Amino acid sequence: MKAVKLTAAVVVLFMAPYVPITSSRSLAETPNDSIDRHLRHESAQIDSKLKEVEGKHDSNTPLQRRDQTLVAAHRVYDPVSGLACSLVGECMSCPITEKDESFCRETGYRQELACPHSKDEALLQTLEEKQTPRYRPCSPADTVRPGVTFVKFEAIMSLLLAISVTLLRREREKHMSSFDLRKDSRQRVGLLNSSASGVKDSD
């Protein structure tokens, strides 16, 4: 009996140093695990919020620079607002007061842009501080219709044809008049010769 108690006491004494160490480790590891889980949870929430914001931004402005291939031919990308704006009116010459503007320096012509309103308040404030309405540089050839160009080409060709026909007629008249003069002179010479021979025969 004493041997059993002694053995139990030895076992308890032998295991005693390890029990608090393991418990302290478990106590020390528990807050770290909770902190890690909390950080992972917060990062997941932040990622989800970023995705939602990007999704809303893309839905409000679906035609960004990366989606320029989706912009229709009658629309143009505006780098200021990040939106696809419609072209308004024709390409007009810049007035003297706007010659130094960025949209007039390149070609001296400008075309108005009609851009949709953004839901971003900061962006709206930025756009209001800039020129309103907005313009883009252009050249008169950008807005010329193909039909108008064809009509102008046909008119020029018709004018050249009329001029060439007139010149040709004048040249023909000159040649014909000189030919008629030569013909008349020959006829006169023939008449004179025939009259002279007739006079000789009568003699």
UniProtKB/Swiss-Prot annotation:
<dbReference type="GO" id="GO:0030430">
    <property type="term" value="C:host cell cytoplasm"/>
</dbReference>
<feature type="short sequence motif" description="RxLR">
    <location>
        <begin position="37"/>
        <end position="40"/>
    </location>
</feature>
<feature type="glycosylation site" description="N-linked (GlcNAc...) asparagine">
    <location>
        <position position="32"/>
    </location>
</feature>
<keyword id="KW-0964">Secreted</keyword>
<dbReference type="GO" id="GO:0005576">
    <property type="term" value="C:extracellular region"/>
</dbReference>
<keyword id="KW-1035">Host cytoplasm</keyword>
<protein>
    <recommendedName>
        <fullName>Secreted RxLR effector protein RXLR-C28</fullName>
    </recommendedName>
</protein>
<keyword id="KW-0843">Virulence</keyword>
<keyword id="KW-0732">Signal</keyword>
<comment type="function">
    <text>Secreted effector that does not suppress pattern-triggered immunity (PTI) in plant host.</text>
</comment>
<comment type="similarity">
    <text>Belongs to the RxLR effector family.</text>
</comment>
<feature type="glycosylation site" description="N-linked (GlcNAc...) asparagine">
    <location>
        <position position="193"/>
    </location>
</feature>
<feature type="signal peptide">
    <location>
        <begin position="1"/>
        <end position="24"/>
    </location>
</feature>
<keyword id="KW-0325">Glycoprotein</keyword>
